[in-house]
Amino acid sequence: MTKEKSTVPRLRFPGFTDAWKQRKLGEVADFSIKTNSLSRDKLSSYFYEVQNIHYGDILTKYDAILDVCNKELPSIIGSTISDFADALLSEGDIVFADAAEDSTVGKAIEVRNFKGKNVVSGLHTIVARPKVSYAPYYLGYLINSTAYHNQILPLMQGTKVSSISKANLKSTTVVFPTLPEQEVIGSFFSDLDQLITLHQRKLDDVKELKKALLQKMFPKGNGNDFPELRFPEFTDAWKQRKLGEFMKESKILGSKGDIARKLTVRLWGRGVVSKKEIYSGSSATQYYIRKSGQFIYGKLDFLNQAFGIIPPELDGYESTLDSPAFDLLKGINGQFLLEFVSRKEFYYYQGNIANGSRKAKRIHTE
């Protein structure tokens, strides 16, 4: 066993002063637990005796801690406990996804709260079972930290699909304080996750409410001048006009693509932002200056709700004519316009009557 090294984090809870220990993961965890290579078609949402952790779910569905009792896991079709007796997971096991199409390879979960359920680890996974006592949740959060994952990045292999080997995982370093400090850290991050889940549910509820109100607070057309639902102080009939009467396309000549400060319209109504590669591009591509308050959309992503109002901080940034921008004329409010065009019945109808295939429709300004 190698000599233990000590380290101290920059931020820690008050009352703890002891140095942290540093060890190779292969020294403190057993990697001999069996996994299976069952594909998705061998799994079912119906309950069988043995449930399975698939690497794809680790990468996309599960957080750092997998609460088995309160999470729906796929079952292995026709499985019995005797078939997998030597592969059953235990409380506190760490399960790594050893393959991915990007740098998420090595993402892991700490498995907790079995409550009698029988769970095994599946395709493209590696199980690390702690050989020493760790506080609940501590390892799960540690191994999903940026500091730990940065150790994995140079150890990845492959081009189109990246992978990490069991030997390389064993060579990575884990750090840990005393058990009482581990308990405080684990509980802290667990509480944060629960808070995030609570707010996510509230957010989902508000999104559903907004979706319903967008259907009811605009007239449905076909000669209907009144919305189904409106604020009580307003009783006048709504007017119906062509959108072009309220906006004028802006074509202020800007820079070429190699020097333009670029902006882009995010999908699904998530606003207008600067591009990460702000100054990269072709010197042959012409860009146009955009102004704060203009309405802008993506021609190729019209069906993906690529609409926005340019914010003040992006005043003077540029886009090509594939993301045209419009000055809004008197008589229309920019936020009202944005909500109006963000309704599914609007952008789906306009997109479906446009020319081009479903995957490559370019919605022109006229």
Functional labels for PLM-detected ranges:
Residues 12-36, 171, 229-253:
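Non-catalytic DNA-recognition/assembly elements of restriction-modification systems
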Residues 22-23, 198-200:
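Amphipathic, low-proline, heptad-repeat alpha-helices and/or compositionally biased low-complexity charged/polar-rich
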Residues 29-176, 244-366:
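DNA target-recognition domains and sequence-specific DNA-contacting regions of bacterial/archaeal
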